[in-house]
Amino acid sequence: MDKSDSLLQSSSKGLRSSIFFQGSSRILTFFLNQLTIRLTSPSAYAFSSIHFEILQSTILFLSRESVRLAMQRIPSENAIITSTSTESNKSKKLSDQLQLIKNTSLISVYIGIVISLLVSLFYFYSLPNFPYSKTCIFIYTVSSFIELLSEPYYEVLQWRQKFSKTASAEGLGTIICSLLSFAISVLGRNKAPSSLPFALGNLSEKVTIFFTLRYFAKQPFSIFLHKVGENERYIFWDSSTLRIICSHTYQVLLKHLITKGDKIMVAWYASPSAQGPYALASNYGSLLARIVFRPVEDHSHIVFAQLTHYKNKKDEKKALNLLAWILKLYSYMSLFILFGSNYSDIVLLFGAGSKWASPDSSSILSWYAMYIPFMAANGVLEAFYVSAANSSQLYDQGKCYLASAVFYFITGKFLLSWFNLGSHGLILANILNLSLRICFALRFILHNYKDFSLPRSLPRPFLLALSILLSIISSFLVKHWRESKVPFLVYFLSAPSLAILYSCFIILVDKDVRGYAKILLSKYYIK
Protein backbone atom coordinates (compact mmCIF):
# COMPACT_ATOMS: atom_id res chain seq x y z
CA MET A 1 0.00 0.00 0.00
CA ASP A 2 1.48 3.38 -1.00
CA LYS A 3 1.51 6.52 1.12
CA SER A 4 -1.53 8.09 -0.54
CA ASP A 5 -3.69 5.00 0.07
CA SER A 6 -2.52 4.95 3.69
CA LEU A 7 -3.43 8.61 4.01
CA LEU A 8 -6.89 8.02 2.53
CA GLN A 9 -7.53 5.11 4.88
CA SER A 10 -6.43 6.95 8.01
CA SER A 11 -8.35 10.03 6.94
CA SER A 12 -11.51 8.03 6.19
CA LYS A 13 -11.29 6.41 9.61
CA GLY A 14 -10.87 9.82 11.19
CA LEU A 15 -13.71 11.22 9.09
CA ARG A 16 -16.09 8.45 10.14
CA SER A 17 -15.10 8.99 13.78
CA SER A 18 -15.46 12.73 13.38
CA ILE A 19 -18.92 12.43 11.83
CA PHE A 20 -19.92 9.88 14.50
CA PHE A 21 -18.74 12.01 17.40
CA GLN A 22 -19.96 15.24 15.84
CA GLY A 23 -23.27 13.58 15.00
CA SER A 24 -23.88 11.89 18.35
CA SER A 25 -22.68 14.87 20.36
CA ARG A 26 -24.59 17.36 18.21
CA ILE A 27 -27.82 15.36 18.37
CA LEU A 28 -27.50 15.01 22.14
CA THR A 29 -26.60 18.66 22.58
CA PHE A 30 -29.34 19.64 20.12
CA PHE A 31 -32.01 18.30 22.48
CA LEU A 32 -30.29 19.83 25.51
CA ASN A 33 -30.05 23.16 23.72
CA GLN A 34 -33.76 23.07 22.90
CA LEU A 35 -34.52 22.74 26.60
CA THR A 36 -32.11 25.60 27.32
CA ILE A 37 -33.63 27.80 24.60
CA ARG A 38 -37.09 27.26 26.08
CA LEU A 39 -35.76 28.81 29.32
CA THR A 40 -34.00 31.67 27.51
CA SER A 41 -35.32 34.93 26.12
CA PRO A 42 -34.76 35.66 22.40
CA SER A 43 -32.55 38.65 23.24
CA ALA A 44 -30.27 36.61 25.54
CA TYR A 45 -29.99 33.86 22.95
CA ALA A 46 -29.18 36.43 20.25
CA PHE A 47 -26.35 37.86 22.36
CA SER A 48 -24.86 34.40 22.83
CA SER A 49 -25.31 33.11 19.28
CA ILE A 50 -24.46 36.31 17.42
CA HIS A 51 -22.43 38.85 19.41
CA PHE A 52 -20.34 36.48 21.53
CA GLU A 53 -20.01 33.94 18.73
CA ILE A 54 -18.49 36.70 16.57
CA LEU A 55 -16.13 37.62 19.42
CA GLN A 56 -14.87 34.07 19.88
CA SER A 57 -14.67 33.13 16.21
CA THR A 58 -12.72 36.33 15.48
CA ILE A 59 -10.11 35.47 18.11
CA LEU A 60 -9.80 31.82 17.09
CA PHE A 61 -10.00 32.19 13.32
CA LEU A 62 -7.57 35.09 12.98
CA SER A 63 -5.11 33.54 15.44
CA ARG A 64 -4.87 30.00 14.14
CA GLU A 65 -6.46 29.52 10.71
CA SER A 66 -3.46 30.53 8.59
CA VAL A 67 -1.19 28.39 10.80
CA ARG A 68 -3.48 25.37 10.46
CA LEU A 69 -3.67 25.73 6.69
CA ALA A 70 0.11 25.94 6.39
CA MET A 71 0.75 22.95 8.64
CA GLN A 72 -1.51 20.72 6.56
CA ARG A 73 1.24 20.73 3.93
CA ILE A 74 3.85 19.36 6.34
CA PRO A 75 4.65 15.66 5.73
CA SER A 76 2.85 13.43 8.22
CA GLU A 77 4.58 11.19 10.74
CA ASN A 78 3.78 8.14 8.63
CA ALA A 79 5.22 9.79 5.50
CA ILE A 80 8.51 10.48 7.30
CA ILE A 81 8.69 6.91 8.61
CA THR A 82 8.16 5.36 5.18
CA SER A 83 10.52 7.73 3.35
CA THR A 84 13.47 7.52 5.77
CA SER A 85 15.76 4.51 5.40
CA THR A 86 18.04 4.32 8.45
CA GLU A 87 16.64 4.03 11.96
CA SER A 88 18.90 6.74 13.42
CA ASN A 89 17.95 9.28 10.75
CA LYS A 90 14.30 8.37 11.19
CA SER A 91 14.36 9.00 14.94
CA LYS A 92 16.19 12.33 14.54
CA LYS A 93 13.89 13.50 11.77
CA LEU A 94 10.75 12.60 13.70
CA SER A 95 12.02 14.34 16.83
CA ASP A 96 12.94 17.51 14.94
CA GLN A 97 9.66 17.57 13.02
CA LEU A 98 7.65 17.12 16.22
CA GLN A 99 9.38 20.08 17.83
CA LEU A 100 8.92 22.22 14.72
CA ILE A 101 5.20 21.44 14.78
CA LYS A 102 4.92 22.48 18.43
CA ASN A 103 6.92 25.65 17.77
CA THR A 104 4.82 26.56 14.75
CA SER A 105 1.53 25.94 16.56
CA LEU A 106 2.66 28.34 19.29
CA ILE A 107 2.48 31.15 16.73
CA SER A 108 -1.31 30.90 17.16
CA VAL A 109 -0.90 31.42 20.91
CA TYR A 110 1.33 34.47 20.52
CA ILE A 111 -0.94 36.06 17.92
CA GLY A 112 -3.95 35.18 20.07
CA ILE A 113 -2.66 37.23 23.00
CA VAL A 114 -2.76 40.41 20.91
CA ILE A 115 -6.02 39.65 19.11
CA SER A 116 -7.79 38.63 22.34
CA LEU A 117 -6.91 41.95 23.98
CA LEU A 118 -7.96 44.02 20.97
CA VAL A 119 -11.24 42.22 20.34
CA SER A 120 -12.29 42.12 24.01
CA LEU A 121 -11.54 45.83 24.45
CA PHE A 122 -13.59 46.62 21.37
CA TYR A 123 -16.53 44.65 22.76
CA PHE A 124 -16.22 46.19 26.22
CA TYR A 125 -16.79 49.67 24.77
CA SER A 126 -19.15 48.93 21.86
CA LEU A 127 -21.52 46.16 22.96
CA PRO A 128 -25.01 47.31 24.05
CA ASN A 129 -25.66 47.03 27.77
CA PHE A 130 -27.17 43.72 28.85
CA PRO A 131 -27.18 41.75 32.16
CA TYR A 132 -23.71 40.27 32.80
CA SER A 133 -22.51 41.45 29.38
CA LYS A 134 -19.06 42.51 30.64
CA THR A 135 -18.67 39.24 32.56
CA CYS A 136 -19.63 37.26 29.47
CA ILE A 137 -17.10 39.15 27.34
CA PHE A 138 -14.36 38.26 29.81
CA ILE A 139 -15.42 34.59 29.99
CA TYR A 140 -15.62 34.17 26.20
CA THR A 141 -12.20 35.80 25.79
CA VAL A 142 -10.60 33.53 28.39
CA SER A 143 -12.22 30.41 26.92
CA SER A 144 -10.97 31.37 23.45
CA PHE A 145 -7.41 31.70 24.72
CA ILE A 146 -7.65 28.35 26.51
CA GLU A 147 -8.56 26.72 23.19
CA LEU A 148 -5.57 28.42 21.56
CA LEU A 149 -3.34 26.90 24.26
CA SER A 150 -4.48 23.47 23.08
CA GLU A 151 -3.24 24.10 19.50
CA PRO A 152 0.14 22.32 20.01
CA TYR A 153 -1.70 19.17 21.10
CA TYR A 154 -4.18 19.46 18.23
CA GLU A 155 -1.44 19.83 15.62
CA VAL A 156 0.59 16.94 17.03
CA LEU A 157 -2.45 14.66 16.73
CA GLN A 158 -3.14 15.89 13.19
CA TRP A 159 0.51 15.24 12.24
CA ARG A 160 0.20 11.72 13.63
CA GLN A 161 -3.08 11.32 11.69
CA LYS A 162 -4.99 10.62 14.91
CA PHE A 163 -8.07 12.37 13.58
CA SER A 164 -10.51 10.40 15.72
CA LYS A 165 -8.80 11.71 18.87
CA THR A 166 -9.43 15.35 18.00
CA ALA A 167 -13.02 14.49 17.06
CA SER A 168 -13.50 12.79 20.44
CA ALA A 169 -12.17 15.82 22.30
CA GLU A 170 -14.43 18.23 20.43
CA GLY A 171 -17.46 15.98 20.86
CA LEU A 172 -16.89 15.58 24.60
CA GLY A 173 -16.42 19.33 24.98
CA THR A 174 -19.69 20.03 23.19
CA ILE A 175 -21.61 17.65 25.46
CA ILE A 176 -20.12 19.18 28.63
CA CYS A 177 -20.99 22.66 27.34
CA SER A 178 -24.64 21.77 26.73
CA LEU A 179 -25.05 19.99 30.07
CA LEU A 180 -23.63 22.89 32.07
CA SER A 181 -25.55 25.54 30.10
CA PHE A 182 -28.80 23.68 30.69
CA ALA A 183 -28.09 23.16 34.41
CA ILE A 184 -27.28 26.85 34.97
CA SER A 185 -30.36 27.91 32.96
CA VAL A 186 -32.57 25.73 35.17
CA LEU A 187 -31.02 27.11 38.36
CA GLY A 188 -31.34 30.72 37.18
CA ARG A 189 -34.68 30.51 35.38
CA ASN A 190 -36.35 32.96 37.79
CA LYS A 191 -33.65 35.59 37.40
CA ALA A 192 -33.16 38.26 34.74
CA PRO A 193 -32.39 36.74 31.32
CA SER A 194 -28.71 36.77 30.39
CA SER A 195 -26.12 34.95 28.30
CA LEU A 196 -24.19 33.82 31.38
CA PRO A 197 -25.27 30.12 31.13
CA PHE A 198 -23.98 29.96 27.55
CA ALA A 199 -20.73 31.71 28.52
CA LEU A 200 -19.99 29.33 31.40
CA GLY A 201 -20.92 26.36 29.22
CA ASN A 202 -18.52 27.59 26.55
CA LEU A 203 -15.73 27.92 29.12
CA SER A 204 -16.29 24.34 30.29
CA GLU A 205 -16.16 23.16 26.66
CA LYS A 206 -12.76 24.75 26.00
CA VAL A 207 -11.29 23.47 29.27
CA THR A 208 -12.50 19.96 28.41
CA ILE A 209 -10.99 20.15 24.93
CA PHE A 210 -7.66 21.36 26.33
CA PHE A 211 -7.23 18.56 28.86
CA THR A 212 -8.58 15.85 26.52
CA LEU A 213 -6.21 16.82 23.70
CA ARG A 214 -3.31 17.03 26.15
CA TYR A 215 -4.11 13.52 27.39
CA PHE A 216 -4.25 12.10 23.84
CA ALA A 217 -1.13 13.93 22.61
CA LYS A 218 0.96 12.91 25.64
CA GLN A 219 3.13 16.02 25.35
CA PRO A 220 4.27 18.33 28.17
CA PHE A 221 2.68 21.76 28.38
CA SER A 222 4.88 24.66 27.32
CA ILE A 223 4.35 28.05 25.70
CA PHE A 224 8.07 28.57 25.05
CA LEU A 225 9.95 27.84 21.85
CA HIS A 226 12.72 25.24 21.66
CA LYS A 227 15.50 25.23 19.09
CA VAL A 228 15.73 22.50 16.50
CA GLY A 229 19.06 21.48 14.98
CA GLU A 230 19.17 21.19 11.22
CA ASN A 231 22.31 20.91 9.10
CA GLU A 232 24.53 22.23 11.90
CA ARG A 233 22.34 25.27 12.46
CA TYR A 234 19.48 25.88 14.84
CA ILE A 235 16.04 27.17 13.94
CA PHE A 236 12.68 27.74 15.63
CA TRP A 237 10.49 27.49 12.53
CA ASP A 238 10.76 26.17 9.01
CA SER A 239 11.10 29.13 6.63
CA SER A 240 8.86 27.61 3.93
CA THR A 241 6.07 27.06 6.47
CA LEU A 242 6.36 30.68 7.63
CA ARG A 243 6.03 31.89 4.04
CA ILE A 244 2.86 29.85 3.59
CA ILE A 245 1.46 31.25 6.85
CA CYS A 246 2.12 34.80 5.66
CA SER A 247 0.57 34.09 2.26
CA HIS A 248 -2.61 32.83 3.95
CA THR A 249 -2.98 35.72 6.42
CA TYR A 250 -4.61 38.16 4.02
CA GLN A 251 -7.07 35.54 2.72
CA VAL A 252 -7.94 34.45 6.26
CA LEU A 253 -8.88 37.99 7.29
CA LEU A 254 -11.10 38.45 4.25
CA LYS A 255 -12.60 34.98 4.59
CA HIS A 256 -13.55 35.71 8.19
CA LEU A 257 -15.32 38.92 7.17
CA ILE A 258 -17.22 37.03 4.48
CA THR A 259 -18.00 33.95 6.59
CA LYS A 260 -19.26 35.91 9.58
CA GLY A 261 -20.58 38.80 7.51
CA ASP A 262 -24.21 37.83 8.03
CA LYS A 263 -23.88 37.79 11.82
CA ILE A 264 -21.86 41.01 11.79
CA MET A 265 -24.60 42.77 9.82
CA VAL A 266 -27.35 41.27 11.98
CA ALA A 267 -25.48 42.34 15.13
CA TRP A 268 -25.02 45.95 14.07
CA TYR A 269 -27.95 46.66 11.73
CA ALA A 270 -30.86 44.37 12.66
CA SER A 271 -33.25 45.20 15.49
CA PRO A 272 -32.99 43.14 18.72
CA SER A 273 -36.36 41.52 17.95
CA ALA A 274 -35.02 40.28 14.59
CA GLN A 275 -31.72 38.97 15.99
CA GLY A 276 -33.33 36.16 18.02
CA PRO A 277 -35.16 34.42 15.12
CA TYR A 278 -32.09 34.73 12.90
CA ALA A 279 -29.85 33.25 15.61
CA LEU A 280 -32.28 30.35 16.03
CA ALA A 281 -32.46 29.76 12.27
CA SER A 282 -28.67 29.80 12.09
CA ASN A 283 -28.50 27.25 14.91
CA TYR A 284 -31.00 24.88 13.30
CA GLY A 285 -30.00 25.51 9.73
CA SER A 286 -26.33 24.84 10.35
CA LEU A 287 -26.89 21.62 12.33
CA LEU A 288 -26.25 19.49 9.24
CA ALA A 289 -23.24 21.65 8.42
CA ARG A 290 -21.72 21.09 11.85
CA ILE A 291 -22.38 17.33 11.85
CA VAL A 292 -21.36 16.44 8.28
CA PHE A 293 -19.96 19.34 6.27
CA ARG A 294 -17.43 20.67 8.76
CA PRO A 295 -15.72 17.28 9.43
CA VAL A 296 -15.65 16.58 5.69
CA GLU A 297 -14.14 20.00 4.97
CA ASP A 298 -11.52 19.70 7.72
CA HIS A 299 -10.39 16.26 6.54
CA SER A 300 -10.52 17.32 2.89
CA HIS A 301 -8.02 20.08 3.64
CA ILE A 302 -5.57 17.52 4.96
CA VAL A 303 -6.09 14.89 2.24
CA PHE A 304 -6.05 17.36 -0.66
CA ALA A 305 -2.91 19.07 0.67
CA GLN A 306 -1.03 15.77 0.92
CA LEU A 307 -2.22 14.37 -2.43
CA THR A 308 -1.55 17.51 -4.49
CA HIS A 309 1.65 18.68 -2.79
CA TYR A 310 4.11 16.56 -4.81
CA LYS A 311 2.34 16.96 -8.21
CA ASN A 312 2.07 13.20 -8.69
CA LYS A 313 -0.47 12.37 -11.43
CA LYS A 314 -1.73 9.26 -9.67
CA ASP A 315 -2.28 11.11 -6.39
CA GLU A 316 -3.86 14.09 -8.17
CA LYS A 317 -6.36 11.75 -9.81
CA LYS A 318 -7.26 10.33 -6.40
CA ALA A 319 -7.79 13.85 -5.09
CA LEU A 320 -10.04 14.74 -8.05
CA ASN A 321 -12.06 11.54 -7.64
CA LEU A 322 -12.50 12.27 -3.96
CA LEU A 323 -13.63 15.82 -4.76
CA ALA A 324 -16.17 14.54 -7.31
CA TRP A 325 -17.41 11.96 -4.81
CA ILE A 326 -17.99 14.56 -2.09
CA LEU A 327 -19.73 16.98 -4.47
CA LYS A 328 -21.99 14.16 -5.68
CA LEU A 329 -23.15 13.39 -2.15
CA TYR A 330 -23.58 17.09 -1.40
CA SER A 331 -25.75 17.53 -4.49
CA TYR A 332 -28.18 14.86 -3.32
CA MET A 333 -28.25 16.26 0.21
CA SER A 334 -29.14 19.60 -1.37
CA LEU A 335 -32.09 18.05 -3.19
CA PHE A 336 -33.37 16.65 0.11
CA ILE A 337 -33.20 20.17 1.52
CA LEU A 338 -35.17 21.48 -1.47
CA PHE A 339 -38.37 19.80 -0.28
CA GLY A 340 -37.37 19.33 3.36
CA SER A 341 -37.19 23.08 4.01
CA ASN A 342 -41.00 23.19 3.95
CA TYR A 343 -41.08 21.36 7.28
CA SER A 344 -39.49 24.14 9.34
CA ASP A 345 -42.72 24.55 11.36
CA ILE A 346 -42.30 21.04 12.75
CA VAL A 347 -38.70 21.75 13.76
CA LEU A 348 -39.67 24.92 15.61
CA LEU A 349 -42.73 23.44 17.32
CA PHE A 350 -40.93 20.38 18.67
CA GLY A 351 -37.62 22.16 19.19
CA ALA A 352 -37.71 25.66 20.59
CA GLY A 353 -41.39 25.64 21.54
CA SER A 354 -44.46 27.63 20.63
CA LYS A 355 -43.02 31.04 21.63
CA TRP A 356 -40.44 30.70 18.84
CA ALA A 357 -42.76 29.09 16.26
CA SER A 358 -43.83 32.26 14.46
CA PRO A 359 -44.37 32.49 10.69
CA ASP A 360 -41.36 34.83 10.46
CA SER A 361 -39.05 32.39 12.27
CA SER A 362 -40.31 29.52 10.12
CA SER A 363 -39.71 31.50 6.93
CA ILE A 364 -36.18 32.50 7.99
CA LEU A 365 -35.35 28.87 8.83
CA SER A 366 -36.60 27.69 5.42
CA TRP A 367 -34.48 30.29 3.63
CA TYR A 368 -31.44 29.40 5.72
CA ALA A 369 -31.87 25.74 4.79
CA MET A 370 -31.60 26.70 1.11
CA TYR A 371 -28.33 28.48 1.91
CA ILE A 372 -26.68 25.33 3.36
CA PRO A 373 -25.92 23.59 0.01
CA PHE A 374 -23.98 26.64 -1.18
CA MET A 375 -22.04 26.69 2.08
CA ALA A 376 -21.21 22.97 1.76
CA ALA A 377 -20.08 23.11 -1.89
CA ASN A 378 -18.01 26.23 -1.30
CA GLY A 379 -16.30 24.64 1.71
CA VAL A 380 -14.97 21.58 -0.11
CA LEU A 381 -14.09 23.49 -3.32
CA GLU A 382 -12.09 26.08 -1.38
CA ALA A 383 -10.44 23.27 0.60
CA PHE A 384 -9.14 21.90 -2.70
CA TYR A 385 -8.11 25.33 -3.95
CA VAL A 386 -6.18 26.26 -0.80
CA SER A 387 -4.46 22.86 -0.74
CA ALA A 388 -3.42 22.85 -4.41
CA ALA A 389 -2.75 26.52 -5.16
CA ASN A 390 0.69 28.13 -5.26
CA SER A 391 1.54 31.52 -3.73
CA SER A 392 0.42 33.60 -6.72
CA GLN A 393 -2.85 31.68 -6.96
CA LEU A 394 -3.45 32.21 -3.25
CA TYR A 395 -2.95 35.93 -3.87
CA ASP A 396 -5.58 35.73 -6.63
CA GLN A 397 -7.92 34.09 -4.15
CA GLY A 398 -7.30 37.00 -1.80
CA LYS A 399 -8.42 39.40 -4.52
CA CYS A 400 -11.51 37.27 -5.05
CA TYR A 401 -12.25 37.39 -1.31
CA LEU A 402 -11.87 41.17 -1.30
CA ALA A 403 -14.21 41.58 -4.26
CA SER A 404 -16.79 39.19 -2.81
CA ALA A 405 -16.58 40.87 0.62
CA VAL A 406 -17.29 44.29 -0.88
CA PHE A 407 -20.06 42.77 -3.00
CA TYR A 408 -21.57 41.01 0.01
CA PHE A 409 -21.71 44.02 2.32
CA ILE A 410 -23.10 46.28 -0.41
CA THR A 411 -25.69 43.68 -1.43
CA GLY A 412 -26.57 42.88 2.18
CA LYS A 413 -27.06 46.51 3.12
CA PHE A 414 -29.02 47.09 -0.09
CA LEU A 415 -31.40 44.17 0.55
CA LEU A 416 -31.62 44.84 4.29
CA SER A 417 -32.35 48.58 4.16
CA TRP A 418 -33.74 49.45 0.75
CA PHE A 419 -35.92 46.40 0.16
CA ASN A 420 -36.61 45.82 3.88
CA LEU A 421 -36.05 42.08 3.48
CA GLY A 422 -34.46 41.82 6.92
CA SER A 423 -32.86 38.46 7.66
CA HIS A 424 -34.12 37.09 4.34
CA GLY A 425 -32.04 39.70 2.53
CA LEU A 426 -28.89 38.71 4.40
CA ILE A 427 -29.40 35.04 3.52
CA LEU A 428 -29.92 35.96 -0.14
CA ALA A 429 -26.76 38.10 -0.08
CA ASN A 430 -24.88 35.12 1.39
CA ILE A 431 -26.09 32.85 -1.40
CA LEU A 432 -25.00 35.35 -4.08
CA ASN A 433 -21.61 35.81 -2.40
CA LEU A 434 -20.94 32.07 -2.12
CA SER A 435 -22.00 31.59 -5.73
CA LEU A 436 -19.21 33.95 -6.80
CA ARG A 437 -16.65 32.08 -4.72
CA ILE A 438 -17.85 28.69 -6.00
CA CYS A 439 -17.44 29.89 -9.60
CA PHE A 440 -13.92 31.15 -8.82
CA ALA A 441 -12.82 27.83 -7.28
CA LEU A 442 -14.42 25.80 -10.08
CA ARG A 443 -12.67 27.91 -12.71
CA PHE A 444 -9.32 27.14 -11.06
CA ILE A 445 -10.02 23.39 -10.91
CA LEU A 446 -11.36 23.10 -14.47
CA HIS A 447 -8.45 25.15 -15.85
CA ASN A 448 -5.64 23.32 -14.02
CA TYR A 449 -7.03 19.79 -13.77
CA LYS A 450 -8.39 18.57 -17.09
CA ASP A 451 -9.26 15.15 -15.62
CA PHE A 452 -11.94 16.66 -13.38
CA SER A 453 -15.47 16.07 -14.70
CA LEU A 454 -18.09 18.46 -13.34
CA PRO A 455 -21.10 16.54 -14.80
CA ARG A 456 -19.96 13.51 -12.79
CA SER A 457 -20.53 15.54 -9.62
CA LEU A 458 -24.09 16.61 -10.49
CA PRO A 459 -27.35 14.72 -9.83
CA ARG A 460 -29.26 12.93 -12.56
CA PRO A 461 -31.87 15.18 -14.29
CA PHE A 462 -34.69 12.80 -13.35
CA LEU A 463 -33.79 13.03 -9.64
CA LEU A 464 -33.62 16.83 -9.84
CA ALA A 465 -37.09 16.92 -11.40
CA LEU A 466 -38.39 14.52 -8.75
CA SER A 467 -37.04 16.74 -5.96
CA ILE A 468 -38.86 19.74 -7.45
CA LEU A 469 -42.08 17.70 -7.63
CA LEU A 470 -41.72 16.64 -3.98
CA SER A 471 -41.07 20.27 -3.05
CA ILE A 472 -44.37 21.27 -4.69
CA ILE A 473 -46.18 18.50 -2.81
CA SER A 474 -44.68 19.50 0.55
CA SER A 475 -45.51 23.18 -0.11
CA PHE A 476 -49.11 22.18 -0.80
CA LEU A 477 -49.27 20.21 2.45
CA VAL A 478 -47.82 22.96 4.63
CA LYS A 479 -50.14 25.58 3.09
CA HIS A 480 -53.24 23.50 3.73
CA TRP A 481 -52.06 22.51 7.20
CA ARG A 482 -51.72 26.18 8.17
CA GLU A 483 -55.25 26.71 6.86
CA SER A 484 -56.44 23.71 8.94
CA LYS A 485 -57.43 21.81 5.80
CA VAL A 486 -54.94 18.99 6.39
CA PRO A 487 -54.51 17.19 9.76
CA PHE A 488 -51.20 17.77 11.52
CA LEU A 489 -50.48 14.03 11.57
CA VAL A 490 -50.67 13.87 7.76
CA TYR A 491 -48.35 16.87 7.44
CA PHE A 492 -45.96 15.42 10.03
CA LEU A 493 -45.80 11.90 8.51
CA SER A 494 -45.33 13.24 4.99
CA ALA A 495 -41.79 14.39 5.90
CA PRO A 496 -40.23 10.94 6.52
CA SER A 497 -42.41 9.40 3.79
CA LEU A 498 -41.11 11.75 1.09
CA ALA A 499 -37.53 11.37 2.34
CA ILE A 500 -37.69 7.55 2.19
CA LEU A 501 -39.32 7.64 -1.24
CA TYR A 502 -36.64 9.96 -2.59
CA SER A 503 -33.83 7.86 -1.09
CA CYS A 504 -35.14 4.76 -2.85
CA PHE A 505 -35.23 6.56 -6.19
CA ILE A 506 -31.63 7.77 -5.74
CA ILE A 507 -30.41 4.22 -5.12
CA LEU A 508 -32.40 2.87 -8.06
CA VAL A 509 -31.47 5.56 -10.60
CA ASP A 510 -27.86 6.46 -9.77
CA LYS A 511 -25.53 3.46 -9.84
CA ASP A 512 -22.62 5.63 -8.64
CA VAL A 513 -24.35 6.13 -5.29
CA ARG A 514 -24.41 2.39 -4.71
CA GLY A 515 -20.66 2.28 -5.27
CA TYR A 516 -20.11 5.32 -3.04
CA ALA A 517 -22.15 3.69 -0.28
CA LYS A 518 -19.89 0.64 -0.38
CA ILE A 519 -16.83 2.89 -0.15
CA LEU A 520 -18.27 4.76 2.81
CA LEU A 521 -19.12 1.56 4.64
CA SER A 522 -15.76 -0.11 4.05
CA LYS A 523 -12.87 2.25 3.36
CA TYR A 524 -11.77 5.00 1.05
CA TYR A 525 -10.26 3.47 -2.05
CA ILE A 526 -10.27 5.80 -5.03
CA LYS A 527 -9.61 4.06 -8.33
UniProtKB/Swiss-Prot annotation:
GO terms for cellular component: endoplasmic reticulum; endoplasmic reticulum membrane. The keyword Transport applies. It comes from the Eukaryota. Keywords: Endoplasmic reticulum, Membrane, Sugar transport, Transmembrane, Transmembrane helix, Transport. One of its GO terms (molecular function) is glycolipid floppase activity. It is a multi-pass membrane protein. Disulfide bonds: none annotated. Pathway: Protein modification; protein glycosylation. Pfam families: Rft-1 (PF04506). It is found in: Endoplasmic reticulum membrane. The keyword Glycosyltransferase does not apply. The chain crosses the membrane at residues 42-62, 106-126, 137-157, 167-187, 319-339, 364-384, 402-422, 426-446, 461-481, 488-508. One of its GO terms (biological process) is dolichol-linked oligosaccharide biosynthetic process. Belongs to the RFT1 family. Intramembrane glycolipid transporter that operates in the biosynthetic pathway of dolichol-linked oligosaccharides, the glycan precursors employed in protein asparagine (N)-glycosylation. The sequential addition of sugars to dolichol pyrophosphate produces dolichol-linked oligosaccharides containing fourteen sugars, including two GlcNAcs, nine mannoses and three glucoses. Once assembled, the oligosaccharide is transferred from the lipid to nascent proteins by oligosaccharyltransferases. This is Man(5)GlcNAc(2)-PP-dolichol translocation protein RFT1.
